[in-house]
Structures are given as C-alpha cells and as structure tokens.
C-alpha cells in the first residue's frame, strides 16, 4: 500500500547526505510503497481496489481523482473527527444559521483530520500531461530509470497514463484537454520506455495512440518542447529544432531580450534547453529508440526533411502560432549563425556560453536544494548535470529530489506542477478556519498551521550578487510550497502575511506566539519592492521588459510566458495584506503603503474589462479574478456605492448565476478568454464559493441576499457524509492554456465561503 510520508520522516538515514534542507525538510511530501502486507488491512486493500476501479470505469467523464489514497491513510483520524450526518437543505427551505454551523463543524472535523503532522495540508497538484514524459525520458537516457523508479512506481505511472488517455487514443496538454501531438507523442514514448509493448494496453490503447499520432502526420508535428525531448532521446534530430543558442546568456543585460529580463519560469526552462541544444546531446541509441523511430513517423526516419520540420506543428497544439517575424528570426539563426558556432573559431564562444549556462544551472540547483523552480527545469537541470559529469554529486543530489514531485492517487502516479502547494493551501486554510469563528474548537489545527507558516517564511536573500543571478530580494517572502524550494511569489507572500496577521489577533495560548514584527516588516518590504510602475504586481519579480517580447515566444502551446506580467490576483492579494498590516501596525511605512494601495487600486480598475469582469490567470477564471478584484478594491476603501468597478463586477457575476443557483465555470474560459459555463450548466463548488465571497464583500447581503442563499444551499448540499466535499472539474491554470489541479480547494473555499455567509449574511 502507498503511504504518504511528510517532513523529516520522508528522509531515510541513508538519504540524509543527499537531501539538503534549511528547515529540517518541513513540508516535504513523498509517497512510498509499503511492501509490508501486515500493515494493510483487507478493508483498506479493498477500498484501494474499488477506488481504482471506480475511477477507471468513469475516466472519460470524471478526469479528477479525489485523493482517496490520502483519505484511506487518514481513515482513523477522519473517523475520530466525524460530526454526524450531512445537513441537506431543500429547495425553497430557509437556510438556518445552526444548519450552516453544523455543516462547518463536519467540514472542519474532516479537514483537520487530514492535516499533516507538519501543520500543512498535502494534496494533488497534478494536471499537466507533459511533465511525466520528460522525467521518464531523462531517467532513461541517464540509465537510472529502474533504480529511481521502483516497479510499483512504474506500474502506477502506466496506470495514470492509460487512465488519462482520451477516447480518440491521444492525450491532451492536461487531463481535461482534447488530444494534442505534444501530449500524445510524449506519453506514447513514456509508456514505451516504462516497458509497455507497441501494441500493449487494454483495448489496444497503444495501437490507438500510435494511430492518432500517424493520422496527423507523425511526431514531426510535435511542438518545440516536444521536439527537444525527442531529440534528447534520439528519436528526432537536432537539425529539426529551431535554435536555442546559449550565447544569449553572454549578451549585455541592457538589451530588452536578455534572458535575465524574462519571466523566471521562461528563462529557467530555456536555460538548460540552450545547454542541451548547444551540446547537441543525444542519449544512447538503443533498440527501443530505433523502434520508436519507426513507430512515430509516416515515412522512413532517414527521409524526413528536418529543416521543414522545425516549424511544423499540429493544428491541435497551435495555441500561440509563431508570428512570421519569429520564423524569419529562427531561420536566420539556423542557417547563418549556428554553422559559425559549431566549428572553430566560433566554437570557442559556444564553449564559453555553455560554461556560463552551467554556472546558472548550478546556482539554481543549489539555491533550491535541487528541487528547482518547477518540474520542467528540474528534470532538464538534472539531465544537464549528468551530461556535464555522470558521476557528479550534483546529479546524485538531483535524483534524491525526483520523488518530491511525484503524487499517487486512485488514478495512478503523476508528476506534479510544483513540489506541492503547501504554504499556499495552508495560508488559505487558516483564513478559512478563522472565518468560521470556530477557532476554540480547532485551536490545535490552527496552532500547527501557524507554526508551518512561520517556519516556511524565507529568512535570507539568495547568496551572491542578485544582479549576476537575476534574482529579486527574498528575505521575508513566502513560497508556494516549502522553504527549501526557496522561490518567492508575490501572492503567496501576501497570503502568508495575511494569515500571520489574522492569527496575531488571536490569543497566543490558543494558536501560538505571533510572528515577530521584524519578520512581518520584512514581508512588507518584499511586497513594496515588487510593485511595478503601473501599480500592478507580477508573480515572482518585477516586470523587467516589454510585452512586445512575446513576439519571440517560441512555445506554441502557451501564451504570455516571456515576461512576468502584472496580475489582478497578485495585485489584489498584496493590497489586502498591506491594508491589514497597516491596520495592525499603523506606524510602519504608512505613507508608502497608502501610495502603493492607491496605485494598485487604479491598476485593478484599468484591468477591468468593459463587461465588468477581470480575467484570471491563475484560477478558473472570471469567477476567480472577480473574487480577487472586488476584495482588492474593498481593501483600498472602495465600496459598492462609491465605486463603479465594484458595481460592474457584481453585475457581471450575478449575470452568470445558474438557474438553480451557484456558478460553474469551465477551463475553456481561460483558453478562449470568454466566460464559459461547465458542460451541462453544472455548478461547481469552488466557483460558487469564490463568487459567494466576492458578493458578500461587496455588500450583496444588504441589497438582495437571495443569490447568496442559493449559493450557500448548493455548498451545504454538496457535502459528503464524512465532511469532505466532492472533487469536481479542474480549477487551476497557468500560461492561459494549461490547467492544474488544486485538490485542497474543494475543502478550503466551501468552508471559507460558508463561514463568511454564516457570520456576515445570516442573522441570529
């Protein structure tokens, strides 16, 4: 049976040397297979098999797992926290305050039971389907696939890939997406490397997958990221890639297209890609690689026109088509520049550029304890370290962090989009629990969560000259996941600060000692340093270049990736945090804070669309951004009566209410930038909770509470008997077009919204 190990228990004595930490591994989460049959009860084993069977049977209709393995592991704790049967409110029946409190008590009973001993909440952060294949290819090429991934890991990975294969035989960019060449070719290759036969899988799954690929022209039509991975494996030629010259890292920073000016995820992915491209690295040409060369293409491998293939992309993948200017640019570099730097004397500059790239790779690895910014650059950096020296400590240190990214549930094992969302979920959870006013009953839960937030704050800046490594100040910030990860994010810092400030208002005998004021001030300092001239806040750093740089975005699959844009969500979260800080600590940098909030409010108003909506870049989508937009403006002192933007936002959200109450927004809203209901006009608990809180914040209860009552009824009626809430469609997004699961949202936001509803809308 699989068991989740968290924190220090996730590191064995023999691994301690190779798993670096600045926080005693706080928040680390690793799934391990327990081979001790005596540790598993027949009841648990039956539950696991039933969960797997149920997911597989419904896989084409319900793409999200419900993290049932985690619930089975915490079964005893959940039973202890049980508070009786769920309350159901009939249509037309008045929602009573006691009924809401009863629902909240059951919800918190369940949610407290699944809190880890470290104080955070572990949950699935999967969804993208292009991550696992990159890991499998890298481990295969370096010859460590079967030593890093046990037989049980490989079985679960195959289960996951088969479970998320679409009915047409292909795979999407993410688990709810339609089939793409990027997803289909890479996942087909991953299954072959994991040991599946070319005609294996139930119901001819591999045959169907191959047919999907070949019917659309074969793997030459894969996206640029896919071309790189296939080149590394040896089933695609480097001459079929558009150039990724590492010499970009030698250019002066004053140039607007210097990599240091790009969004950190963009530069950190293209950094190792440029190293591999500059090296033209290819793994061992094995019989399986030779077989894949035959399986993936419609013509013999040696007859493929690789130059033509550079700009070939399947129509199913083409979210961001290359502008003509970009094709001319890459063509010029390909035909003129690259030949000069692959032979003497230009090769000397290429070697210098490769050395510079590796210095940046090693800096990123060491500064993140080999977790790295995200899963893509994690695997690419690991591969680069092996290419540089297969026996290096750097490569060994990387291998020990692979499992930080793996998550298993009833649908199988995936690679997550980060090493978790531990801090993010915990900061939200604290605010949700505080909103219920059931603090007395759940003080131990809050105390553990409080400790986690305090210990997760980044307490030092990155070493060395930040200008050399293109880093922002970090001291006082919070990450999305763990302190060991080490990368600040603006809205994570804001939510961490808000949670800390809220708990500072409660008795320390209940929730622990508050965070020291100097550390609160450090967080404020980081937030103030992140505001752009237009008043908005980007995600990780200041916006360092111009939107026109998107013209050279080479990733056909993703939008708006080249620079770090200011976001509605990051801006609004920061406004809330600064407002609360000013209220509790009025003497610290008050004038600067007031100025920052005023500029941010103006930014939010400018970002609002004509119909009253805001486009959400990190959640689905208009409901998510609407919640943040309204909260941010209210934090700035605006009201429904005084602010046209708030009135328009409320009108927009109310216009999207479903006939039976609630809201249900599809991920297609993100992709197409047009509000789109879920298929069948189904309501979604998380969208409904976001809108319920947004409308409460804007004073809807004083004008017409009927939509609020309908939303609350929907949330209450969706609670399961054990206090959990049902897992529905995907709610996270990045880069406009790729979705990501935040499994804890199904608990956090219904609890938070019902808490706000209970105490701000209902009367005694």
UniProtKB/Swiss-Prot annotation:
InterPro entries referenced in this protein's UniProt entry, alphabetically: SQ_cyclase_C (IPR032696), SQ_cyclase_N (IPR032697), Squalene_cyclase (IPR018333), Terpene_synthase_CS (IPR002365), Terpenoid_cyclase/PrenylTrfase (IPR008930)
Query: Could you state one GO cellular component term attached to this entry?
Result: lipid droplet
Keyword Isomerase set for record: yes
Q: Which Gene3D superfamilies does the UniProt record give? A: 1.50.10.20
Top class in the EC scheme: isomerase
Q: Which PANTHER family match?
A: TERPENE CYCLASE/MUTASE FAMILY MEMBER, TERPENE CYCLASE_MUTASE FAMILY MEMBER
Query: Would you tell me the protein name for this molecule?
Result: Cucurbitadienol synthase
């Amino acid at each position: 049976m699989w068991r989740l190990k968290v924190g220090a228990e996730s590191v064995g004595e023999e691994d301690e040397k190779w798993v670096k930490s600045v926080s005693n591994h706080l928040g680390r989460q690793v799934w391990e297979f327990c081979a001790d049959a005596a540790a598993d009860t027949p009841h648990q084993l039956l539950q696991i098999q039933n969960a797997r069977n149920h997911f597989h049977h419904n896989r084409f209709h319900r793409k999200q797992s419900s993290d049932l393995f985690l619930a089975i592991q915490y079964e005893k704790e959940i039973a202890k926290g049980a508070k009786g049967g769920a309350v159901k409110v009939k249509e037309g029946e008045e929602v009573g305050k006691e009924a809401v409190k009863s629902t909240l008590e059951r919800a918190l009973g369940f949610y407290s039971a699944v809190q880890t001993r470290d104080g955070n909440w572990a949950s699935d952060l999967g969804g993208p389907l292009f991550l696992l294949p990159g890991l499998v290819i890298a481990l295969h090429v370096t010859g460590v696939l079967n030593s890093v991934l046990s037989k049980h890991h490989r079985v679960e990975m195959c289960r996951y890939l088969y479970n998320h294969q679409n009915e047409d035989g292909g795979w999407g960019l993410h688990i709810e997406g339609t089939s793409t060449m990027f997803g289909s070719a890479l996942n087909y290759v991953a299954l072959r490397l994991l040991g599946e036969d070319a005609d294996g899988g139930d119901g001819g799954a591999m045959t169907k997958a191959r047919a999907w690929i070949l019917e659309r022209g074969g793997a030459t039509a894969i996206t640029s990221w896919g071309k790189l991975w296939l080149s590394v494996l040896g089933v695609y030629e480097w001459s079929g890639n558009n150039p990724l010259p590492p010499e970009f890292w030698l250019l002066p920073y004053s140039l607007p297209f210097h990599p240091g000016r790009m969004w950190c995820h963009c530069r950190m992915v293209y950094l190792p890609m440029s190293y591999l491209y500059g090296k033209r690295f290819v793994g061992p040409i094995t019989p399986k690689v030779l077989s894949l060369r035959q399986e993936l293409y419609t013509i013999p491998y040696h007859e493929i026109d690789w130059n033509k293939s550079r700009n070939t992309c399947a129509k199913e993948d083409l979210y961001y088509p290359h502008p003509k200017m970009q094709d001319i640019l890459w063509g010029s570099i390909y035909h003129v520049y690259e030949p000069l730097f692959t032979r003497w004397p230009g090769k000397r500059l290429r070697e210098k550029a490769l050395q510079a790239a590796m210095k940046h790779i090693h800096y990123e690895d060491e500064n993140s304890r080999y977790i790295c910014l995200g899963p893509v650059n994690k695997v690419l950096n690991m591969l680069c370290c092996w290419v540089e020296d297969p026996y290096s400590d750097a490569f060994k240190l990387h291998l020990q962090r692979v499992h930080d990214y793996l998550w298993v549930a009833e649908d199988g094992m995936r690679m997550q989009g980060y090493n978790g969302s531990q801090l993010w979920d915990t900061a939200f959870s604290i605010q949700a629990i505080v909103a219920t006013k059931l603090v007395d009953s759940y003080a131990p839960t809050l105390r553990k969560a409080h400790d986690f937030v305090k210990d997760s704050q980044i307490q030092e800046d990155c070493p060395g000259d930040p200008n050399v490594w293109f880093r922002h100040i970090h001291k006082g910030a919070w990450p999305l996941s763990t302190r060991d990860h080490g990368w600040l994010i603006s809205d994570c810092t804001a939510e961490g600060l808000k949670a800390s400030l809220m708990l500072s208002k409660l008795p320390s005998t209940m929730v622990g000692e508050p965070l020291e004021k100097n550390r609160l001030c450090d967080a404020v300092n980081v937030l103030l340093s992140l505001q752009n001239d237009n008043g908005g806040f980007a995600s990780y750093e200041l916006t360092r270049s111009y939107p026109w740089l998107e013209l050279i975005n080479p990733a056909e699959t993703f939008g708006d990736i080249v620079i770090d844009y200011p976001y509605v969500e990051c801006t609004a979260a920061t406004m809330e945090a600064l407002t609360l800080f000013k209220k509790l600590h009025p003497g610290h940098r008050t004038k600067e804070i007031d100025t920052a909030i005023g500029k941010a409010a103006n930014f939010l108003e400018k970002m609002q669309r004509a119909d009253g909506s805001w486009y959400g870049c990190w959640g689905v989508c208009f409901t998510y951004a609407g919640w943040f937009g309204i909260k941010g403006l209210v934090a700035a002192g605006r009201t429904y009566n005084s602010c046209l933007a708030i009135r328009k936002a409320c009108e927009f959200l109310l216009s999207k209410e479903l006939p039976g109450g609630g809201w249900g927004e599809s991920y297609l809203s993100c992709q197409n930038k047009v509000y789109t209901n879920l298929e069948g006009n189904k309501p979604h608990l998380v969208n409904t909770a976001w809108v319920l809180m947004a409308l409460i914040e804007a004073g809807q209860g004083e004008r017409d509470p009927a939509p609020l009552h309908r939303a609350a009824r929907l949330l209450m009626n969706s609670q399961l008997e054990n206090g959990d809430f049902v897992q529905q469609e995907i709610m996270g997004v990045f880069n406009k077009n790729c979705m990501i699961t935040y499994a804890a949202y199904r608990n956090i936001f219904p609890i938070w919204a019902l808490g706000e509803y209970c105490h701000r809308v209902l009367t005694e």
